[in-house]
């Protein structure tokens, strides 16, 4: 499909898929079984609005790709890429490429009025990826990360990215 028609084609196909009660939709040009409109919108908005944050954008697209790979889905790496997208955005916004996520969140909390509860929630989510099944570190055993885990992380991280980008655009 030519690029000029791609967006219209995807919208048309998604309308047909929804009308026929299909369990699939296109999200960022990838066929996936994410069908909830809010989840799709959150992921697509994060991908589209993170274009100016290339590291974030690359990680989000990789997370979606790992999640939707029909031949060999890689849920562990989808989770890793989802949280890495958040980390990349926060580090970029902090202005310190060597900053940790915690230091970056402190900077964002001060400069963009990030609520302490949001900061704590994200820190906890990041901790989950550091501790559980070695998601971000060397695997010791076979991963127990499921599709639901990976989808949750992609949608949640996309929502957080949308929130932070929205907060910085308000200032």
Task: For every predicted segment, state its role.
Residues 5-8, 20-22, 71, 122-124, ...:
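A general marker of short, structured functional hotspots
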């Amino acid at each position: 499909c030519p690029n000029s028609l791609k967006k219209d084609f995807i919208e048309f196909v998604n309308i047909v898929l929804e009308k026929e009660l299909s369990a699939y939709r296109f999200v960022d040009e990838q066929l996936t079984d994410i069908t909830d409109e809010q989840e799709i919108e959150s992921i697509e908005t994060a991908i589209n609005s993170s274009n100016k944050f290339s590291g974030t954008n690359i990680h989000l697209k990789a997370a979606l790709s790992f999640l939707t790979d029909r031949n060999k889905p890689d849920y562990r790496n989808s989770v890793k890429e989802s949280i890495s997208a958040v980390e990349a955005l926060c580090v970029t916004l902090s202005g310190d490429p060597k900053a940790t996520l915690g230091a970056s969140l402190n900077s964002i909390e001060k400069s963009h009025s990030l609520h302490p509860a949001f900061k704590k929630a994200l820190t906890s989510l990041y901790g989950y990826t550091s501790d559980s099944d070695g998601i971000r570190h060397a695997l010791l055993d076979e991963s127990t990360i499921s599709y639901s885990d990976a989808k949750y992380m992609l949608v949640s991280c996309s929502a957080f990215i949308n929130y932070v980008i929205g907060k910085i655009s308000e200032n």
